[in-house]
């Protein structure tokens, strides 16, 4: 956590502009659809921000990803907004990434859908929460791939929890130190409240207009699931316990905390961990397992590490840096090539979402296992 302050000082001192994106991160999902992306700031006036000393209402940043079957005009969108990209260049420069790496990246997006069809299609919604001290933008490519399989995805940045959140008016909120049990509990509770707030925005015409321009809405938008990585996975479990509108949840590599461990819930839930992260090694997974009384599965991904479930492996592969970075990067990202890891995560998450939100068959997991032999079904 101490890296945040020094990174911010470097960022403020340099403040470089975003260069033209030269490397496009690919959509590797098997069911390819063009995806539109938009971001908006949303404010929950019903609660105060627990991290702000002046009692201001809680404001968050959210990105919306939604597929279109008919795209009239495409655009290479910068992978991250300018200040965030500069911040990440400095942060991950410590791992050997060349300066300007994140500023050089782009996403192939749909800028203008066809007048008929396109983004007006009625689709289920996936809510996403990332890791502690991690920008939502470090999951943009993965979430674009999930959206391409036929879902609206709403990705949430949790200010003061994420290492940096950049708002449209130029405001930058940096993270606070979150280390003690009490601090983690506050962060978790705040995340669950953020997720609940965003889940209600599909009934808010103003929010939909900002996050999903051109989207007409429909009953399927009220079919929702939640996916989270790391602390976001813990938040996904907490949200499943408290938000009745959620039909299922996925925890990617996150240890869990709080009353959900003993209370549990009866809706579908999937655990996917990196190599050696299972019920046998994570007490929270072992504790919650018997209290998950609905459909459940646990998977272990061999040769993966904690941040394998982010865009970082794909970024490194797309930049041609596989095998060229310090050995300690493997402790962070594992050894699975980036396109394959993104495809693996997308395939398993989409199989779960199809099952709980679209009535898909459970045998999709067996088919995925045949393709991705790194994945072991633990339970």
Predicted stretch roles:
Residues 120, 247-309:
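The feature captures the conserved acid-bearing segment of alpha/beta-hydrolase catalytic domains
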